[in-house]
């Protein structure tokens, strides 16, 4: 009978170049979520994993423990999450996923966004949504009600995963991308069946794809060639399409969609309030590179949702599918529905 895991044994396993099993990973994350791991133990785990490179089994084990500990979110899982890992080399990319989520919801697709405050970036989803008037302090049951009333809601990680607070200081002090950047997009407590997920670190794409594939989930996983966890407009992006256990890879040039190239500087923000103001302007219909990148990423979410209902869509060229979805997203913005959706959502969280 194998002996019970210990922190020295697990960290030694990693620094010797070996990997943790699913059960060992689950044990370690349970310790973290319960506050039973010391900052030194957690820091050692995060750094050792970062150095050795996480495996799908390790991420599955960590994810299982996080969801086991999560507060329930009673919502129809036939919904969409648009999210990114963060951890890009710039540290100041606009909150594109948050804006894209609002646009997607304004087209009629139910959106359950999951996120947290910034740890490895200047402005996390929770930060910018607060600045946009979304009340993150509502009770978990109210979060589900807001989805039913408005078609969009936000699962604030600090609310639904209270155990994450035990890792916050260590993550902040390390200041690097860690396994938590990978876990975030995988731990939505509502378990939505469609996901559009940006991954900044190319080495971690197989992890994200592998977990979605193992779950039998539907997802578009993507990364800009400029290193951002978004479909970019500065150049090409790579997309990994996961459907029914199969993975199809695509290369995307925004020019194929009629979207002009933009300098990376146009996609960077200066802070929470500034990012919120950019989102307001985009939702109000202001043209420019910020609008273009939001529409592109909203299109990815819309395509992931449609793929969930019709897996045969994988047979069509990705550029054609996304071009159609960009048109849908643009119409939602230009009609005023996207801006109205933000106001409706904010009001519902304050009701």
Swiss-Prot record:
Anthranilate 2 binds at residue 171. Anthranilate 1 binds at residues 84, 116. GO terms for cellular component: cytosol. Its EC number is 2.4.2.18. It catalyses: N-(5-phospho-beta-D-ribosyl)anthranilate + diphosphate = 5-phospho-alpha-D-ribose 1-diphosphate + anthranilate. Pathway: Amino-acid biosynthesis; L-tryptophan biosynthesis; L-tryptophan from chorismate: step 2/5. One of its GO terms (biological process) is L-tryptophan biosynthetic process. Binds 2 magnesium ions per monomer. GO terms for molecular function: anthranilate phosphoribosyltransferase activity; magnesium ion binding. It comes from the Bacteria. InterPro entries: Anthranilate_Pribosyl_Tfrase, Glycosyl_Trfase_fam3, Glycosyl_Trfase_fam3_N_dom, Glycosyl_Trfase_fam3_N_dom_sf, Nuc_phospho_transferase. Belongs to the anthranilate phosphoribosyltransferase family. This is Anthranilate phosphoribosyltransferase. It comes from Clavibacter sepedonicus. The gene is trpD.
């Amino acid at each position: 009978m194998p002996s019970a895991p210990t922190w020295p044994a697990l960290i030694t396993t990693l620094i010797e170049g070996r990997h943790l099993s699913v059960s060992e990973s689950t044990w370690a994350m349970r310790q973290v979520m319960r506050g039973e791991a010391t900052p030194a133990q957690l820091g050692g785990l995060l750094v050792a994993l970062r150095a050795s490179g996480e495996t799908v089994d390790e991420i599955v084990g960590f994810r299982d423990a996080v969801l086991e500990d999560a507060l329930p979110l009673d919502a129809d899982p036939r919904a969409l999450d648009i999210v990114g890992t963060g951890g890009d080399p710039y540290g100041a990319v606009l909150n594109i996923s948050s804006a894209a989520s609002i646009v997607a919801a304004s087209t009629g697709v139910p959106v359950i966004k999951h996120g947290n405050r910034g740890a490895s970036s200047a402005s996390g989803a929770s930060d910018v949504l607060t600045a946009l008037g979304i009340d993150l302090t509502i009770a978990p049951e109210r979060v589900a009600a807001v989805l039913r009333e408005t078609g969009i809601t936000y699962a604030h990680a600090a609310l639904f995963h209270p155990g994450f607070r035990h890792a916050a200081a260590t993550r902040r002090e390390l200041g690097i991308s860690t396994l938590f950047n990978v876990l975030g997009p995988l731990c939505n407590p509502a378990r939505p069946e469609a996901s559009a997920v940006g991954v900044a670190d190319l080495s971690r794409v197989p992890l994200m794809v592998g977990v979605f594939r193992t779950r039998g989930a539907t997802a578009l996983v993507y990364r800009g060639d400029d290193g951002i966890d978004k479909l970019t407009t500065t150049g090409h992006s790579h997309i990994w399409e996961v459907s029914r256990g199969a993975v199809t890879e695509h290369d995307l040039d925004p020019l194929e969609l009629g979207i002009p190239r933009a300098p990376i500087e146009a996609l960077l923000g200066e802070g929470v309030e500034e990012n919120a103001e950019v989102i307001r302007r985009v939702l109000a219909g202001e043209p420019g590179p910020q609008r273009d990148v939001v529409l592109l990423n909203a299109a990815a979410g819309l395509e992931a949702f449609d793929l969930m209902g019709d897996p045969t869509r994988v047979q069509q060229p990705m550029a054609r599918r996304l071009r159609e979805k960009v048109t849908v997203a643009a119409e939602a913005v230009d009609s005023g529905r996207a801006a109205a959706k933000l106001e409706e959502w904010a009001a519902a969280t304050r009701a």
